[in-house]
């Protein structure tokens, strides 16, 4: 373990809840404080090119990878590591735990549940190892109440379908169970 204290900060929530926006906000705050930051994004999310881009078009440069083990942990010189779409990385727990134990600050933005309201990937296993966990809500795109869930509105049945408003809605509990929107 490194003598400098690292930690893990997780930002969870449904689609359109501002997870990536909050991740970028925190990263920019660390940059103002003269911390060096590295941003990692899921390589199969090609909606906005190589960088991390929010639905509001705020952006930061990012390294696209399929798996976190593609990154040589010993070569990371950054103080802070931001990871977007953390639910897609099967090695998220081991990577974050190792890096935090070696003095790095990890900020992970991720969906907590699938469109079926099931745990998404390995991300919930990271919670017991995290110092900070924030669960955001969105606005229900049907009734405009508070939304905690992502509902797929396209016909695909695979868990990993990357998309935006053309494929998903943020919904509340009541609207999640409505058949026709």
Swiss-Prot record:
It catalyses: thymidine + ATP = dTMP + ADP + H(+). Substrate binds at residues 115, 159-163. Keywords: ATP-binding, DNA synthesis, Kinase, Metal-binding, Nucleotide-binding, Transferase, Zinc. ATP binds at residues 13-20. One of its GO terms (biological process) is DNA biosynthetic process. Disulfide bonds: none annotated. Its EC number is 2.7.1.21. The active site is at 85 (proton acceptor). Zn(2+) binds at residues 140, 143, 172, 175. GO terms for molecular function: ATP binding; metal ion binding; thymidine kinase activity. InterPro entries: P-loop_NTPase, Thymidine_kinase, Thymidine_kinase_CS. Pfam families: TK (PF00265). Belongs to the thymidine kinase family. This is Thymidine kinase. It comes from Yaba monkey tumor virus (strain VR587). The lineage of its organism: Viruses, Varidnaviria, Bamfordvirae, Nucleocytoviricota, Pokkesviricetes.
